Structure formats: C-alpha cells, structure tokens
Design a protein with these regions (language model features):
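Catalytic Tyr-X3-Lys loop
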Residues: 98, 114-133, 151, 168, ...
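Conserved mid-core segment of classical short-chain dehydrogenase/reductases
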Residues: 84, 105-122, 164-167, 207
C-alpha cells in the first residue's frame, strides 16, 4: 500500500453514506483506480466487469482484506436487461445507490474516420454511448431517492481534437450531451451529472495504444509537447477527479466537463 492509499483512508468523504457506489468497468485502469479510491474513502462499492473475472476477483479480495464492502457483478452493458440488473443488484445488496460512475467502454483504435465504415462506427456507438444510456436510465429512480451523483469518464478529445481520435471523441461526445441533458432535467430531484475528460495517461487505453504501436515514440513526443505540464497523467489522477465530483464537496457542481489532461485543452 502506498502513501497515497493511506491518504485515501484519511479522507472519508463517503463514510456513513447510505447505500453504495456502482462503478461500471471496474477492472479497467481508470475503473479499478476509482473502485479503490471510493472504497478507501468510505463507500460500499459494486463494480461491473464484462469478461475479466480473474481481475474482478483479485480486486474484490484486495479491498475486502482492507475491510471495505466491495462486490462485483458480470454485466454486458450493451444488453439493456443486464445493465438494469446491475443497478438492481447494487440497490438490493446495499439498500441504496448514491453514486454511478461510468468508466466502461471498448478499446478505441487510433484511425482516420475516412477509414471507419459506418458499421464500425455504429458498433462503437452501441458499445459506448448506448451502454451508458442502458445503465443510467434504470438508475434514475434510485438516484432521485438518494439525491445522488453520476460521473461519466469521457475524454479530453471532445474539447481539443487529436487527429485519428474520431471513434472516441464522437461517441464520448454523445455521452457528454446526454450528461448535460440529464443534469438539466434531473437537478430538480437533487441528482448531479458530470463528466471527467482524461488526457493522455500512462495506463488504461492510452497504455494499450502505446503497447500495440499505434502511438510511436515520435507521436508521444509531440503529444507531450502539447501538454503544458509536459507529462502524462495516471488513472489515479482521473479517479481523484471522479471521487471529488461524486462527493458532497462538489454538491453545487453539475452539468460540467472537467478535463484532467495536464492542460492539453488550454
């Protein structure tokens, strides 16, 4: 356990909060960091995973050993019934739902849109934008009851477009539009909706792009020069923003996109 982990235990933003947080995509880089941070800051957590059962079991065991209330459930969020079942599981197991974090989504290759056929774009919309809607819609009643919060992890690319990122920015842009609409409509019930837009990270999808060669050394150098802080972020940086927006400390913030990108979108 690191010093940062110990600081998480000192910060109990969610201590005593009735119910649980649901994190969609809890075995991904950002998702797992968010699960850990929420749990260590006092929240019960249920997270979803699609196929990586081994990682889900390991994360659950790790946090339970620390005394946290953590459970996982397999769910294909492109399936409307499975997404709704995940919401019911959180409410049934923990009594209420106070936070919903969408940190799921498919791997997104770096490719020019001219090379993306409509069928591939349709699949991306289904696997990301529709998956988010499948999850958030059945959660509304529970979130109204708790005056809860939704945080969608999107991308900084919706505010400053990098070439070959249209598959990500287009579908995540649609998620952001839904978030703003829900913020306007659900605020009367005390429910808040926000987005966190990651920039280039050393883990998560960005790490996979580097590993498979879609981003070579030259591209990485250019990217780093475009970031005022001259470095890449981490999943921990994103989780910090997510948990802040989900907490009562952000109680008057809704309908916003918070870029966590080292200044890339400046």
């Amino acid at each position: 356990m690191t010093d940062d982990d110990n600081q998480d235990f000192d910060n109990q933003d969610f201590g005593g909060r009735k119910g649980a947080a649901l994190v969609a995509g809890g075995t991904g880089g950002i998702g797992a960091a968010t699960v850990r941070m929420l749990a260590r800051r006092g929240s019960a957590v249920l997270f979803t995973y699609r196929s990586n059962e081994q990682s889900a079991e390991a994360l659950t065991a790790e946090l339970r050993a620390e005394g946290a209330q953590v459970e996982s459930v397999r769910a294909d969020l492109t399936d409307e019934d499975e997404a709704a079942s995940a919401i019911r599981s959180a409410v049934d197991r923990f009594g209420a739902l106070h936070t919903l974090v969408y940190a799921a989504g498919p791997h997104v290759p770096m490719v020019h849109l001219s090379k993306v056929p409509p069928s591939q774009y349709r699949h991306q919309l289904h696997a990301d934008t529709l998956a988010f809607y499948n999850l958030v819609h059945p959660a509304l009643d529970a979130l109204r009851a708790s005056a809860g919060s939704v945080v969608a992890v999107t991308t900084a690319a919706t505010h400053r477009y990098p070439v070959r990122d249209g598959l990500s920015s287009g579908t995540k842009g649609a998620v952001e539009a839904v978030v703003r609409a829900l913020a306007a409509e659900e605020g009367r019930y005390g429910v808040r909706f926000n987005c966190v837009g990651p920039g280039m990270l050393t883990d998560g999808i960005a790490a996979r792009l580097i590993e498979n060669g879609e981003l070579d050394d030259a591209a990485l150098q250019v990217t780093r020069r475009n970031i005022p802080l001259r470095r890449f972020g981490t999943a921990q940086d994103i989780a910090e923003a997510v948990t802040f927006l989900a907490s009562d400390r952000a109680g008057f913030i809704t309908g916003q996109h918070v870029a966590v990108d080292g200044g890339y979108t400046v």
